[in-house]
Amino acid sequence: MSRIGRLPIDVPAGVDVKIDGQAVTVKGPKGELSLTVASPIEVKLEEGQVLVTRPDDERESRSLHGLTRTLLNNNIVGVTQGYSKGLEIVGTGYRVAQKGAGVEFALGFSHPVTVEPPAGITFTVEGNNKLTVAGIDKQAVGEVAANIRKIRKPEPYKGKGVRYAGEVVRRKAGKAGK
């Protein structure tokens, strides 16, 4: 058995889990998320716990077992606590500003870069060089944060660019002068 897959998922108070065939819907105080479970995996709700089981020890079943359990757990944590990812903007003249629901970046380009949040994602700007991406879907929060970082990745010589909060950027020595 998968060490992760066999662990039961506790369903906290205020969270409603509905299992309809291969579709699992999780409803909580922050919103609603759904997941389509791959065919060999079975999901059961017993005594306030969600159990994920597999019918056999085939390679596909083994690989999907732990994955399905983790995705369901991420959904339950998402609708109760939510997820957030912090970004820092480093560099002279590099800044971020809130523009309605979206944000506008000045990152050394000839034009400002505007990013609008997809459904279920919110942006919070602290100061002019810190941004927090928040939402209930862990995958969507990480993807939006990665797309923002991709606009201007931290460069290795001065470290300028958009980086995750707490990210350590490997620095290189500049060229040796005479």
UniProtKB/Swiss-Prot annotation:
Domain of life: Bacteria
GO biological process: cytoplasmic translation
InterPro entries (UniProt xref): Ribosomal_uL6-like, Ribosomal_uL6-like_a/b-dom_sf, Ribosomal_uL6_a/b-dom, Ribosomal_uL6_bac-type, Ribosomal_uL6_CS
Entries under SUPFAM superfamilies matching the protein: Ribosomal protein L6
Any one Gene Ontology cellular component term annotated for this protein: cytosolic large ribosomal subunit
UniProt GO MF annotations: rRNA binding; structural constituent of ribosome
Keywords per UniProt: Ribonucleoprotein, Ribosomal protein, RNA-binding, rRNA-binding
Family: Belongs to the universal ribosomal protein uL6 family.
Subunit structure: Part of the 50S ribosomal subunit.
Function: This protein binds to the 23S rRNA, and is important in its secondary structure. It is located near the subunit interface in the base of the L7/L12 stalk, and near the tRNA binding site of the peptidyltransferase center.
Protein name according to UniProt: Large ribosomal subunit protein uL6
Species annotation: Leifsonia xyli subsp. xyli (strain CTCB07)
